[in-house]
Amino acid sequence: MRIFNTMTRRKEEFVPLIPGEIKMYVCGPTVYNFFHIGNARTFVVFDTVRRYFEYKGYKVNFVQNFTDIDDKMIKKANDENITVQQLGDRFIDEYYRDADALNIKRATVNPRATLYISKIIEFIQDLIDKGYAYSVDGDVYFNAKKFNNYGKLSGQNIEQLQSGARIDIDERKKNPMDFAVWKSEKKGEPSWESPWGMGRPGWHIECSCMAYNILGETIDIHAGGSDLKFPHHENEIAQSEGRTGKVFAKYWMHSAFVNINNQKMSKSLNNFFTTREILDKYEPDVIRLFMLSGHYRTPINFSIELLDSTKSALDRICNSIINLEELSSKVKNDGILDSEIKYKEHLNSYKQRYIEKMDDDFNTADAISVIFDLIRDINTNIDENSSMEIIKYSLALIRELGSPLGILQKSKRGSIETEVELLIEKRQKARKDKNWALADKIRDDLKDKGIILEDTSDGVRWKRV
């Protein structure tokens, strides 16, 4: 199994620190708003990575934090005249609602930064004692030049970073690239007692501290969106390795952006859709399939048209699953037929192809193609003359390959039938209103999904093909 390691910029054989176990930390949301579908891609991608590791038999200790204190949260809480904690409580609940709907597994631990303040203070004091941090007027800064390998994740040395980065000018800093690990108290902001006066932690120190206290000095995988590579993850490395003198994470993984009109989707650009908005219109399986239809290190473009196309593709899979479910309730051949023994072995070849794709840096795009190939094969070769065993095996295999992707686990029978009946009613109304264009479009859309309508003297009948 090979993983692309951002640190080395190449695919590497995955070897866990402890055989059979994986310690994985993923940077989670700042809980001041609903998360958008750019965030959702990151969460779905690393949920899939976790699921695939578990499919392979690993025990995964999966930690994803909540940033519940930062500048954006303070501003929004003040704007709404509520406390930062109240704001955090609200949007943590909203996160779980949307993440659960997307079939994202709950983390082993979801730590909140504000519950680790005493540990963060200990961490900072240790950095000061080791000469990696210094206090100035109640603020504490990390001395970036003190850490010899600063910039190794982003592939730049500190001189390049200083000349190319937009840096806040602060004459109190020893070096321009130094960053705050503790911020002194300001009016209207939450604050905690510390050896340096009242204040609050910086963003980067929170993740270093939570990873250290929950997972230990060295973890297997640290992951997040590609926008976190610098400065957030770079600073985490400096803090964590500065404190322990040990490698912070063996593998670094980063997921690419979701773009709209070839521009990164983000709250700052105000060009985003919240996950909640999309969940109101599309099933979770559609959204997950869309998110995983490209390789996780490649940006994907978002549009309603692409989601509709993904929905049509998923409908074809669901129709095949429904056909198998219906066949399993009709056939009378219990044992496997002699002619089906080799076919069962043939079906197993799809599983091997799927594993090969996923073992190659979680290539979900190619793994999904294997599932579609499997569906076409089953549609061609399995019918009412097949045995119960081969029908159930085919159905189980489809669901098995869907499981690491977090899709195809629920029966679609009732939901598909309800949707078809509603569209037939809509078409009937269009015909009554002589809106022939809409009536024809509904018929053609259903045909694209594998549903054929038959207008008879007794009304409209439909069947799957």
From Swiss-Prot:
Q: Which residues hold ATP?
A: 267
Task: Tell me the residue numbers annotated for binding Zn(2+).
Answer: 27, 207, 232, 236
EC annotation? 6.1.1.16
Q: Which cofactor does it need?
A: Zn(2+)
Residue ranges annotated as motif 'KMSKS' region: 264-268
Q: Which domain of life is it from?
A: Bacteria
As given in the record, the signal peptide range reads none
GO cellular component terms listed in the entry, alphabetical order: cytosol
**Its catalytic activity?**
tRNA(Cys) + L-cysteine + ATP = L-cysteinyl-tRNA(Cys) + AMP + diphosphate
Q: Which GO terms describe its biological process?
A: cysteinyl-tRNA aminoacylation
The record's subcellular locations are: Cytoplasm
The cofactor remark states:
Binds 1 zinc ion per subunit.
Give the keywords, sorted: Aminoacyl-tRNA synthetase, ATP-binding, Cytoplasm, Ligase, Metal-binding, Nucleotide-binding, Protein biosynthesis, Zinc
Q: Which GO terms describe its molecular function?
A: ATP binding; cysteine-tRNA ligase activity; zinc ion binding
Q: Which InterPro entries match?
A: Cys-tRNA-ligase, Cys-tRNA-synt_Ia_DALR, Cys-tRNA/MSH_ligase, CysS_C, Rossmann-like_a/b/a_fold, tRNA-synt_1_cat_dom, tRNAsynth_Ia_anticodon-bd
The record describes its quaternary structure and partners as:
Monomer.
Q: What is this protein called?
A: Cysteine--tRNA ligase
What is the species of this protein? Answer: Clostridium kluyveri (strain ATCC 8527 / DSM 555 / NBRC 12016 / NCIMB 10680 / K1)
